[in-house]
Structures are given as C-alpha cells and as structure tokens.
Curated annotation (Swiss-Prot):
Pfam families: AMP-binding (PF00501), AMP-binding_C_3 (PF23562), NAD_binding_4 (PF07993). Its EC number is 1.2.1.-. The modification O-(pantetheine 4'-phosphoryl)serine is found at S613. Belongs to the adenylate-forming reductase family. Contains three distinct domains: an adenylation (A) domain that activates the substrate amino acid which is subsequently covalently linked as a thioester (aminoacyl-S-PCP) to the 4'-phosphopantetheine prosthetic group of the second domain, the peptidyl carrier protein (PCP) domain, as well as a reductase (R) domain of the short-chain dehydrogenase/reductase (SDR) type. The keyword tRNA processing does not apply. It comes from Serpula lacrymans var. lacrymans (strain S7.9). This is Adenylate-forming reductase Nps11. SUPFAM superfamilies: Acetyl-CoA synthetase-like, NAD(P)-binding Rossmann-fold domains. Residues 717-952 are annotated as: Reductase (R) domain. It is an enzyme of class 1 (oxidoreductase). Adenylate-forming reductase, a natural product biosynthesis enzyme that resembles non-ribosomal peptide synthetases, yet serves to modify one substrate, rather than to condense two or more building blocks. The A-domain preferentially accepts benzoic acid as substrate. The natural product of the enzyme is not yet known.
Length: 1099
C-alpha cells in the first residue's frame, strides 16, 4: 500500500559512470536533500519515526572525514581498516567518511579471528584501524599479539553525537563545513575500498573494489530494479551486517541510487558511546518493520523459517512488497508454504567476488517461482555443463559489469563453483542446487564438507557406499549402503539398530574431526534398500545428487520422524496390568537398562543410586516410548500426558510407580505433582524434623576476638575441592588471620585422595599450588551426614574443641532433583550445627553457609528487591527446585541454632581469574555449547548479576573475620550487573575469535532458541545430549524462555530470565570486595571461552 505522506520529488543520480561514488553522495545532498535515507523508530518523534535525510548523511560523512584527517593533512590513499560494533547509521557514515577523507576503507567482520585480521592487514599493508575498543578489546589484544613489531595504530570511531549533531532534524540552514575536496578526480580504475571473502576455506581474502566496480554494482539489478517498486518503498535491512557485501549493497548503494529509504534499528550510542548496538532477533526485526511502516525486508533463511511457524508473523510478511532471502538456502518446503499463502518471496544471489546478480523485483503472479532466480541481463553469464542437467555459473567481465576476482583460465571472469538447474519451461530462470565441490549448506548458512566424513565412515568393512545430505536442513544425515553380504532388513528395527551400532565407532571418529554443526546423529543414519542401490558412475563412484534424489522421500520422512517422535522401547515388555505393584517391577527393569544394567532399589532415591539428569530423561523417554507402543488406545493417549519432570518429582521407583499408575487411570493427571505432597508442607515438615532440639539462643560468654589481625582463626571448610571451595581454601591459606584450616571432604569414588583432588582443583583454576604445602592445611575425609561426621572420636573431638569458624560449602548441585533427594545434605548441615553447638567456642563461633539465591526465587517481586533477611514464609522456596528448597531449610536451621551464623545467598558464579575457570557442566556453558548445535545464540531482556568466584570467596572472608557480629543473611550477587544482550554479543565474538566458528551465530530471542532446543528433545539420544547438554536442563531453559517472553512486555530492565532481584546493601557495607567489584567485561568472557576450549567443551 502506498504511503500518502510520501511527497518528495525524486532526482535519480546517473549510474552511467559520469559520476563516481563520492559524487553521487554529493548529488543527492544537493538534489534530494530532504529525501529519507535511513529511518528508524523512536518514541516521541513525529509519527514515531526518525528520518536521516540524504543531506544529513552527506554532512555526517564529511564530519567523519574532518575527524579522521584534519585539514586533509598527509598523503591520500592510506588503507584504513574498520572493525567496529556501531549503530548502522554511524557505520556507513564512517565508511563513506573514510573515502571522502581520501583514504581507502577496509571494513572487516569483528567475528574474524585475530590471526585472520592480522593476515588481511599484512596483505594490504594496512597500518591503521578504526574500532570500538570498549567492545572488541580481546580481539584487538589478539591482533596486537599477532602483528608483533608491525607498525600499527588503533583509533576509536567518531562518536554518533558528533557526526549527527541534530539526529534527524538537520536542515540546509544548520552550520556545516565540508571537507576539503581532493585536488584531482580519482580515476575509475583506482581502488575505492576493500572487502573480504567469508574465509570458509581458509583465511578471508582481501578483495579490492575499484570506483568502476562500485558504479557497476550500483547499476546492478538488485539495486536499480528496486526502482520498479513504488517510490515509498522502505526496505528493512536491520539484519544485515554493515561490513558485509550484501549489507553495503542494500543499506548503502540501494538508497543512494533508488532513493528508496532503508529501515534500521534505532541507534543506542547517541547518549552512551559505549552502548552495544541492538542485536537482531526475529521478534525485533518484525517490530521494526511495523514501527517504521517498512514494506520490504531482507532476511536470512533461519529467521524466515522461524517466522513461518508464527501466524502473526506470516500476516506481517504477507503485507510486504517483497521478502528477500539471502545468506543460505531456504527450505523449499517452508518457502513453498509461505508463497502459497501470499508471502512475496524473492531469492537473492551474488557474492563479494562478483556483486549482486539478480533482481529483487517480482510480479505477484511470479511468487510461486520464488526458488528460481531471475538473473540480470546486464551480466554476461557462461554456463558450464556438469552433467545430469546441471551447470556451473561463471560471470564474464563486460563493459556493464565488472567482477572483483578473476579466476578463469581463458577469459576475464569469475567461476562461482555454484551449481544451477535450468527451469524446464521458463527462459532465464535458474535454481541454485549446490556447490561444485559438494559442500552442504545448512539452513543456518553453516557449510559442511562431506567427503572427509564419508571416507572415514566408509572405512568400516560393512559399509559399501556413503552419501551425506542436509542442504537447507538444520543438521546433516547420511545415506549408507551396506556392503554385499551385510544386507539389512530396514523394516526390522532391531536389524537397523544393530547395523547403526556396528558402524557407530567410525561415525564417532568422523564426528570428532567435524565442526559441531556437521556431526551426524545416530538417528540420522539412513540405510539403503537392497532393491534401490546407490546410483554410480562407470568408475563405480557414487552419484551424489542422484542418490539424494532417489531417496528424497525417505530423507524427508527421516527428518520428520526424528523431529517429531519419541523412540519406542520394546526391550522391556509392557506390564500385565497398571497396578502400583506391577509398575514397580516394570519401572525397575527400565531403570536398570538406563543405569548400566544395575538393579535399582525401589525404596531409595534413584539419584542416590547413580542417576543423573541424563539417565532420568532417558528413563522418562523409555516410559513414553513404551506407553506409545501399547495396543490400548487409552494407554497410548497417556504417553502424551507424561510431564517432563515426572522422574525428578518422583525420585524413587515406588513413588514413580504411584504417579504413573495415577496417570494411566486418570489422563488428566500428568505426574507433575509427584505423589501430591504439598511442597510447602513438605518443606515445613523437613525443617521441623531437622531443627528439632535447637536452642534458638546461646548463653552469653566471653567471646573470642574477631578481625584483630592476629592468627586466631581455626577454620573448618567443607567442600574444598570444588569450584568455590578451591577459591575459599586459597583465600584462607593466604589470610594472615587464619592459623589452621581443616579441609573436609567426602572420600572419592575413584580412590583419589583429598590431596590429589585438591591439587587438581587448584591446577584447573590456575590457583597457586604452592599454597597447598602450607603448614596451616589439614585434610580430613568423612561424611557430614553420618554421626560425628563419619570421623573417629579423637578427630571429632579435636575439631570440636579447636575450630571457631565453619564455612559449610559442600552441597550436591542438581537443580532437577526434588527436596527429598537432598536429605543427606540437610542432615549433614544439622550435624555440623551440632558440632558447633558442642564446641566450647560456640557463643563466638562463626558458621558461614554458602546458600543460594534459588532459596528465595519465590520472593514477591512486587515488593522490590529481596532483602538480606531471614524469610519466614516457606512459599519463597516451595515453588522452585529441590536444590533451592534444601538451601532454604538450612538457612532456617541456622536461624534457629543460636549460633553467629550467616547464610550467603550466592547468585550465579561465573568463571574468574586467573584462568576463567567455569565448569562445563554448569548451565551457562551448557547453553553456549548447545547453541553451536542449534545454530543460534539466545538473547534475554534484562541484566545478569553474575560474579566471579574470587569475589565470592573474599566477600565471605570479609564477613567471617569482621569485628561486628554478622547478619543472619547476606545476598552475594553482583552490585553492578551487565546487560544479557551485551554479554551474548561478547560470547558470539569470542566463539569466532577462538576459531570455533568461521562466522557469527545469529542471535535470536530466548523463546525461539528454546523452541529449537525443545524440538531436539523429542526422542533425544545420548549423542543429542552430548551435542546439546542443555537438553538435560529443559525445564530450567523453558522457565527462562517463558519469563523472558513476559519480561519483553515491560519497559524497565530487571534480572534476565525473570529471576528475582536481590538487595546487596549489607553485603556492600560489610565487604570492601563487594563495594569495589568491577562489572563483567569482554575480557572476562574471552577467559571463559579459552578455558572451555581447553576442557574440550567444543570438541
């Protein structure tokens, strides 16, 4: 629909070569001064939209030139690299401003590795880099290290407020000083700027762009044909990186030449130069489309496929004049579905080496041909037959279109290696079907090279042939033809499973050498039929494309099955009836199957018998699969009612059988309520049981001094070998006020001594191992849940009479378990309290408990931040995890003990100095690893108050040794939180910087990310859990996703993921560490990533 408010007279700049690129900028400033160039949404502005005119953009570019080269000092032609995270309107003013200054810009991806960037700089003799040092410091440090003695300098990007002083309000009457003009006009053959290739097969390559090349690209079909749409067309380019060829063509050349405006995100750095630009999500892109009345959009397949799942998103897409897809193959199934309901899809094709090659203009009656590319008649193509009706596309140099890279042996031109299929009836239409080198391009844009993996798998003697597939899918699969004599009846599930198991060692070997997104899941092995062998050439080589074609239906069915079903388990027969007694036996057999065939005691918590989150999830899947195989339709219906947490809520086989019996008899019951014990009542009963007989107060005695600087403290530290425990031990051993430390730990199942484990813990975290030789250190092994802590009388009595500080840090870390699974931990806490009460030092003894913020996640957020007080309403913990409930119980036990006790509600502990150590089994590292397999990073609205372990340990000691009596509760969360979005941007940068990815992952809303994860949970295998460990925490991730969806409707920022905000007033009063703690930075993130990589997390 046309915009009636659009009333500009347009004077199109010529693209015949009479004007060069900088002159086109000036032409528009003079002849199209008020025509909108960029538009972005802004509350409070006219119509809610701000427009940057061609005049204002022109002047912004000149202000950049002044800032970079005052008075045009020095010689022309210096190459200036640009690696910056800036707002779009700032980036392009910078890019053009460098040209106007007489320099040659070289925009680079900030997601390149330091080695890749350094190689580009050296190859082009570039000695100067304009950047955003505040957001890219790890990368810049790496570049410095790589360049060594190479003469090089960094310069910050001119701030947005300087180059756009009126930001949307500038007129021709406002003061302005143009940058001094160049003495002579550049020749068309001069290099105007550099771009670089993607680097998918090695380091990115610098690709020069001459003035003539740029003008040819400005006159190319993707740009000029957009003038065929009405003059009020506004193209959404929010998703396009400003350094990328497509971003430059669509966000810069197109509005300059066609005078069609482009919609971008509102700038964030006008008032805060260090603010991170808006991170694209599928949600905020469509929001920008609506708020700026945008009627055309550029997007990548991953986002389009997400929008295809949302009816409301489809309605928005249907209203566009065109939706252009680029950056990877869009699934034809998705594209056809969208086109069938009226979404005006267009495929965009081109490259940095050759520019844009097809028109984005399509008539409405051509929508059904969306997958076919209408190549530009301005470009001279050569089609080289590849057999099977396929052709390689080559672009030949011509007077109307120049390529930037020449690689043909006979004529000037560029061989793309892209393989096309000619439309059977419509002249000029071509379909991109793959690459000459058979690279598989996934829907995320990631590329899988199949040959090495196929060859590895084919080395198994039972394998006769292999062909990988997965183009436009989110993961790959493989066709395997059994060698003659090893035929498989593919209709027999047992034979199929046996064959997969037989070849699995070679598949695992292939997976080890592959990128995360290229790994093959066991369920994605498709075995060929004997009556449909793989097609081969005369030489015996498998014809890859023909093979995928003849198995097209089976491949589609396989993806549908893997993504939508739970594996049926028939190795355990269904019970004869659904009574609790029969179910105890039946569930016991299933439990043994997932527990290495070890018999499980039905009366004992399964998590005390070796189960973890993974085995619990497998047990649930087996239950669902078995129920699904029943001949009783009511039982099959029951399979869909099983709650995700049924095993965690019912952690003994007996309780699980009770819950399952109720589900079968009443499908409305899901098992979510476990045995229907009210959680609050269970929590209060547990508290009553373990606090029985506590004095409440102690008789006053002469207290021993605290905090006087003398070596007077004898400390009992539990759980010293773990993460926080190691930092606590190091801090204690370094502290001059401590005379003796008892490091109390349970004996190890693997037979390693406490000394060995402690040394390993210090080494892993980079702590000073020399401290472990301190004469102040004593190791004790015992079990706090046992009488007298599992110690002999003499050792127990020595502890009782000597210690005056207890730091209780040992605890089971599993957020999936119910309260009853933490009974031994709670009992151990009570035993330690009894130890303290029996001590002659009891009145002055300090008992410090490392609790958790999860003990108060039920706090009423409407009351503000959770205070540093004992919370007597058990509801604050009854609705959360068993882990948090158990910590709450112990906070209350300590409150009733009469001791000088403090419970530290500790928030998320991140990695810390000196190595960035952060356990790869913690939820956030698991999220990061899973994101690689899912092809996206999640963003949540709000802040994170994570803090490093050395800060936690020191804050605890600050309180432990203070002169004043400690308060009963202290909240330890970061007093200066950071935005989740900024943190995730740093994660993305660090993944690329550490060469874990060749290009950045898209960042999507947490809800979308979780949707991908949840789909993977259906029928998840052991390999799925290895690739996506976040599957183990599905309920936790679901909670964050649901909370984030609600939070996005609120304007103010709280804690990301819907977590409670905690007051730190007392913590900062009592601890200098907390008062002076610096926020998390990109440097911290870089340390985490380096540590995770060193632990093999990404292998």
């Amino acid at each position: 629909m046309a915009d009636p408010s659009f009333s500009y007279t347009l004077h199109y700049p010529p693209v015949d070569g009479s004007l060069l690129f900088p002159e086109i900028i000036a032409f528009n400033a003079e002849h199209n001064s008020n025509v909108p160039f960029f538009v972005f949404p802004e509350d409070g502005s006219a119509n809610g939209v701000v427009s940057i005119s061609h005049l204002e953009f022109y002047r912004a570019c000149h202000r950049v030139a002044h800032a970079l080269r005052p008075n045009r000092a020095g010689p022309d032609g210096e190459i200036i690299a640009i690696i910056a995270m800036t707002d779009t309107i700032q980036y392009f003013a910078l890019l053009v401003g460098v040209i106007i200054a007489g320099y040659i810009p070289f925009p680079m991806s900030p997601r390149n590795s330091a080695a890749a960037v350094s190689n580009l700089l050296l190859k082009t003799s570039c000695h100067r880099l304009i950047t955003t040092q505040h957001s890219l410091q790890p990368l810049l440090d790496g570049i410095k290290s790589e360049l060594g003695s190479f003469n090089f300098s960094f310069q910050d990007v001119p701030c947005l407020a300087h180059i756009y002083p009126k930001l949307g309000l500038e007129t021709i009457d406002d003061p302005f000083e143009p940058f001094p003009a160049r003495p002579s006009r550049p020749s068309a053959s001069e290099v105007m700027m550099y771009l670089h290739s993607s680097g998918s097969t090695g380091f990115p390559k610098a690709i020069p762009q001459t003035h003539q090349t740029v003008i040819h690209w400005c006159a190319a079909a993707p740009v000029v044909d957009t003038k065929l749409y009405p003059a009020d067309t506004c193209l959404g380019v929010m998703l396009l990186p400003s350094f990328h060829t497509l971003g430059i063509i669509c966000s810069l050349y197109l509005p300059l030449i066609t005078l069609r405006s482009v919609s971008v995100y509102a700038p964030t750095s006008y008032n805060d130069p260090k603010a991170i630009p808006v991170i694209p999500t599928s949600e905020n892109i469509l929001e920008g489309v609506q708020r700026t009345n945008c009627n055309a959009l550029m997007a990548v397949p991953a986002f389009i496929e997400l929008w295809a799942l949302s009816p409301s998103a489809i309605e928005i897409l249907k209203s566009l004049r065109f939706l252009a897809s680029s950056g990877g193959p869009l699934s034809e199934k998705v594209g056809n579905a969208l086109a069938s309901v009226g979404v005006p899809l267009v495929n965009v094709y081109g490259g940095t080496e050759c520019g844009g090659l097809n028109s984005m203009f399509r008539r409405k009656d051509e929508v059904c041909d969306w997958v076919w590319i209408n190549l530009s008649p301005r470009v001279m193509f050569r089609w080289v037959p590849q057999g099977e009706g396929l052709y390689e596309c080559q672009i030949l140099q011509s007077e109307m279109h120049r390529v930037s890279v020449e690689n043909l042996p006979d004529v000037k031109g560029y061989a793309t290696s892209d393989i096309f299929l000619k439309h059977p009836t419509k002249e000029g239409l071509w379909k991109l079907v793959g690459r000459k080198d058979d690279i598989i391009v996934l829907s995320s844009g990631e590329k899988t090279v199949p040959a090495p993996m196929e060859n590895t798998i084919a080395s198994n003697p039972v394998v006769g042939g292999t062909v990988m597939f997965g183009r436009a899918r989110n993961h790959v699969g493989i066709l395997i033809e059994p060698r003659q004599g090893f035929d498989v009846n593919i209709d027999d599930p047992k034979q199929v499973a046996a064959f997969r198991n037989r070849i699995w060692p070679e598949v695992e070997e292939a997976n080890k050498a592959a990128a995360a997104f290229s790994r093959i899941f066991k369920e994605m092995i498709l075995i060929t039929r004997p009556d449909k062998p793989l097609p081969r050439t005369g030489k015996g080589t498998v014809m890859r494309k023909a093979a995928v074609t003849i198995y097209d239906k089976e491949i589609d069915a396989l993806y549908d099955t893997v993504e939508a079903s739970t594996t049926v388990n028939k190795d355990v027969e269904l019970p004869k009836d659904w009574s609790e007694e029969s179910l105890v036996v039946w569930l016991g057999e299933h439990a043994a199957r997932v527990n290495s065939d070890k018999k499980v005691d039905p009366e004992v918590d399964v998590f005390e018998q070796g189960f973890d989150s993974l085995t619990a999830t497998f047990l649930r899947n087996r239950i669902i699969g078995s129920l699904s195989s029943s001949t009783d339709s009511n039982v099959r219906t029951t399979a869909r009612q099983i709650d995700q947490n049924i095993v965690f809520s019912n952690p003994t086989i007996k309780r699980l059988s009770q819950a399952l019996a109720r589900v079968v008899s009443n499908p409305q019951f899901t098992g979510k309520e476990g045995s229907l014990i009210n959680r609050k009542v269970e929590l209060e009963n547990t508290l009553a049981m373990y606090s029985e007989g506590l004095p409440g107060t102690l008789s006053p005695q002469v207290e021993q001094p605290n905090g006087d600087g003398h070596s007077c403290h004898v400390v009992l530290l539990t759980g010293s070998t773990g993460g926080l425990g190691s930092y606590l031990l190091a801090s204690l051993l370094e502290n001059e006020q401590v005379s003796l430390v008892y490091a109390f730990n349970r004996s190890s199942k693997d037979g390693k001594s406490s000394e060995e484990r402690q040394k390993a813990g210090f080494e892993d975290r980079g702590l000073d191992i020399a401290l472990l030789s301190s004469p102040k250190l004593r190791y004790i092994e015992g079990d706090a849940a046992q009488d007298k802590l599992g110690l002999g009388d003499a050792t127990y009595d020595k502890l009782r009479t000597s210690i005056n500080v207890i730091i209780h840090n040992a605890w089971r870390l599993d957020f999936s378990l119910s309260l009853s699974s933490f009974g031994s931990n709670i009992k151990g806490t009570r035993n330690l309290v009894d130890l303290a009460l029996s001590s002659p030092n009891a009145p002055s003894l300090r008992f410090l408990f490392t609790s958790s913020i999860s003990s108060a996640q039920g706090w009423d957020k409407s009351k503000g931040a959770c205070p540093e007080e004992v919370l007597f309403d058990a509801n604050v913990a009854s609705g959360g995890s068993g882990y948090g409930a158990s910590k709450y119980v112990c906070e209350r036990i300590l409150e009733k003990s009469g001791l000088q006790a403090s419970s530290f509600r500790i928030g998320q502990i991140s990695g810390g100095q000196p190595r960035g150590a952060w356990s790869v089994t913690d939820w956030f590292p698991m999220l990061v690893k899973s994101s690689l397999a899912l092809g996206a990073l999640p963003v949540a609205k709000g802040v994170v108050s994570w803090l490093p372990p050395h800060a936690v340990s020191q804050a605890i000691l600050d309180v432990a040794f203070a002169k004043a009596k400690p308060p009963p509760v202290i909240n330890l969360v970061h007093p200066r939180p950071v935005q989740w979005a900024a943190l995730m941007q740093s994660i993305g940068d660090a993944l690329v910087h550490n060469n874990l990815l060749t290009k950045p992952l898209p960042i999507v809303a947490f809800e979308e990310w979780f949707s991908r994860l949840e789909q993977k949970a259906i029928g998840a295998s052991a390999d799925d859990f290895k690739e996506m460990p976040a599957l183990k925490l599905l309920p936790f991730m679901r909670m964050i996703a649901q909370s984030d969806k609600s939070i996005r409707k609120v304007t103010s920022d709280g804690e990301a993921g819907g977590f409670v905000v905690f007051s730190t007033t007392k913590a900062q009063q009592l601890s200098r560490t907390m008062r002076e703690l610096a926020p998390i930075t990109a440097e911290d993130v870089a340390l985490w990533m380096k540590y995770w990589a060193s632990k093999g997390m990404f292998m």
